[in-house]
Amino acid sequence: MSGGNLQHLYFNKIRVELQKQFEYTNVHQIPKLTKITLNRGLGTLYQQSPKVFESSVSDLMLITGQKPRFNKSKKSIAGFKLREGTVVGLSVTLRRKKMYAFLEKLIHFSLPAARDFRGLSTKNFDGLGNYNLGIKEHAIFPEIDFDKIDHSYGLNICIVTTANNDIEGKALLKFLGMPFKD
């Protein structure tokens, strides 16, 4: 999937609709997607089982199409048995075509495949038009073979926009096809 359909839809139809709805005088005021970040905290899995760590890296690579960045601890904390420099999470930042391809896959395939999915909450906006979404199982993505999963884990997905407030951000994501409850 190229993501061209959603990107084409945004540039040809959604921008015009948003400009009419919010009465923007300048095309640069129209909200757009900036990036999508995926984060996965590893906790103590990295220390306990290297196999789970390697599968987490490969699964995130399959889901996004690019290699994840390793987030390392900044200081040692004895209570958590954590040393400075230990990998504590993985993150991927998607932009441009990969961002639109991932969003299209998320909206049309992954979210409807989630168990008991009834729509996304509109309370997950941060006040600046950015949307945060937590996924409990990474197996909802079509690239992941459910039979080969050793350990199921969740992801945090942050959709960053140039919107000034939640109303503009919600309108943008709704036009893009995000399945909100309301």
Curated annotation (Swiss-Prot):
InterPro entries: Ribosomal_uL5, Ribosomal_uL5_bac-type, Ribosomal_uL5_C, Ribosomal_uL5_dom_sf, Ribosomal_uL5_N. Keywords: Chloroplast, Plastid, Ribonucleoprotein, Ribosomal protein, RNA-binding, rRNA-binding. One of its GO terms (cellular component) is chloroplast. Pfam families: Ribosomal_L5, Ribosomal_L5_C. The keyword Protease does not apply. GO terms for molecular function: rRNA binding; structural constituent of ribosome. GO terms for biological process: translation. It is found in: Plastid, Chloroplast. Binds 5S rRNA, forms part of the central protuberance of the 50S subunit. NCBIfam families: PRK00010.1. Belongs to the universal ribosomal protein uL5 family. Part of the 50S ribosomal subunit; contacts the 5S rRNA. This is Large ribosomal subunit protein uL5c. It comes from Cyanidium caldarium (Red alga).
